[in-house]
């Protein structure tokens, strides 16, 4: 079976999903992705396009690469990742520029655009587009039951949608040893180390994070912040207990998980929440905003806590009421929850069955 994955961007969880799927020996995989992000994709067969942002020249480059690649290669399945790739390819089908009958078309939005906290008229436009283009799709993959419900509520046929959780990989002896060492690490520290991983934007709740930092006692916590803004201007808090690391390579993240006691995830919306699952795999409990899909990826009270991040004082009050020993006691439960519920093999098998079924 020949499968081509098409992505306008592979940042974050998109790259993880594509890499997990293209490792499968049953499938001959090919990936179209941005040249600037190609190092994040491990598949040997890649076709690259020039991307400088979400602009006309970049989308035109992607459009031409898609047309050329599909013309000169034979694929059984086209797997579209995220909204822009989903729009371009399915629009080509709708306007008969590509023969839809030649392919099985799978679409993973990695968070529908209409889930975003945006203006009502924009949501209506996004919903209309997704409903129209669903006709050019054999199967739509929701990464959580929350995303599934949003899609059905938007008028997309539930018969078109399958739920497949994203996954974390337990492959490799080195990774297993690191997880074990991470769970055994209970060094006595003066402060609780708090980790944040994500873009500095509204979706990821960066403003909520800053509000928590401003209220929290400097003597009790160190905040380690991984990520950056998608824009040039953002508020950077200057306090002695706050450290900014910028973006780090995915392969380096485990070291940061092992050095921190708790992950903060104040997102306003998520279709899944991969960072929370990865953190728990390394025994790091999560304090997350009680919204969207996050209740599906955290076991409240067992592997972390679901709270309302709109009230920074309340969040800090909850943090203050628990010692580092309390968080350390959750390590094993975190690891078991993540490794049992979000297995890479389960995710890959689900996708392979979907490829074969349509």
From Swiss-Prot:
Superkingdom classification of source: Bacteria
InterPro entries the UniProt entry points to: Glyco_trans_1 (IPR001296), Glyco_trans_4-like_N (IPR028098), Glycosyltransferase_grp1 (IPR050194)
A Pfam family per the record: Glycos_transf_1
GO MF term set: glycosyltransferase activity
Protein's name in the database: Uncharacterized 41.2 kDa protein in cps region
Organism of derivation: Klebsiella pneumoniae
């Amino acid at each position: 079976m020949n499968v081509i994955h098409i992505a306008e961007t592979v940042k974050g969880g998109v790259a993880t999903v594509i890499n997990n799927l293209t490792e499968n020996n049953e499938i001959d995989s090919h990936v179209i992705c941005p040249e600037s992000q190609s190092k994040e994709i491990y598949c040997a067969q890649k076709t690259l396009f020039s991307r400088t942002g979400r602009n006309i020249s970049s989308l035109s480059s992607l459009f031409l690469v898609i047309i050329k690649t599909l013309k000169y290669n034979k694929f059984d399945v086209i797997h579209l990742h995220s909204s822009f790739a989903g729009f371009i390819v399915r629009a080509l089908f709708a306007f008969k520029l590509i023969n839809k009958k030649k392919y099985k078309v799978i679409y993973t939005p990695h968070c529908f655009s209409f889930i975003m906290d945006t203006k009502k008229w924009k949501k209506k436009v996004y919903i209309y587009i997704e409903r129209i283009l669903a006709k050019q799709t054999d199967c739509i993959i929701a990464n959580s039951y929350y995303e599934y419900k949003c899609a059905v509520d938007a008028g997309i046929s539930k018969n078109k949608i399958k739920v497949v959780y994203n996954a974390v990989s337990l492959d490799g002896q080195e990774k297993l040893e690191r997880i074990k060492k991470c769970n055994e690490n209970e060094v006595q520290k003066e402060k609780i180390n708090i980790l944040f991983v994500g873009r500095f934007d509204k979706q990821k709740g960066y403003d909520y994070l800053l509000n928590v930092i401003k209220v929290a006692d400097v003597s009790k916590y160190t905040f380690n912040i991984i990520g950056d803004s998608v824009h040039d201007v953002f508020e950077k808090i200057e306090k002695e207990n706050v450290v900014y690391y910028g973006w780090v390579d995915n392969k380096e993240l485990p070291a940061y998980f092992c050095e921190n006691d708790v992950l903060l995830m104040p997102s306003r919306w998520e279709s899944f929440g991969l960072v929370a699952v990865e953190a728990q795999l390394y025994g790091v409990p999560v304090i997350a905003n009680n919204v969207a899909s996050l209740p599906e990826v955290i076991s409240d009270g067992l592997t972390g806590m679901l709270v309302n991040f709109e009230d920074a004082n309340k969040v800090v009050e909850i943090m203050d009421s628990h010692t580092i020993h309390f968080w350390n006691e959750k390590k094993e439960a975190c690891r078991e929850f993540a490794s049992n519920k979000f297995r890479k093999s389960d995710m890959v098998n689900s996708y392979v069955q979907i490829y074969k079924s349509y």
